[in-house]
């Protein structure tokens, strides 16, 4: 779940 947030960075 959290990984999806970092993938946009």
Curated annotation (Swiss-Prot):
Keywords: Cytoplasm, Histidine metabolism, Lyase, NAD. It comes from the Bacteria. Binds 1 NAD(+) per subunit. Its EC number is 4.2.1.49. It is found in: Cytoplasm. Transmembrane segments: none annotated. One of its GO terms (molecular function) is urocanate hydratase activity. GO terms for biological process: L-histidine catabolic process to glutamate and formamide; L-histidine catabolic process to glutamate and formate. GO terms for cellular component: cytoplasm. Pathway: Amino-acid degradation; L-histidine degradation into L-glutamate; N-formimidoyl-L-glutamate from L-histidine: step 2/3. Its cofactor is NAD(+). Belongs to the urocanase family. Catalyzes the conversion of urocanate to 4-imidazolone-5-propionate. This is Urocanate hydratase. It comes from Klebsiella aerogenes.
């Amino acid at each position: 779940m959290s990984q999806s947030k970092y993938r946009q960075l």
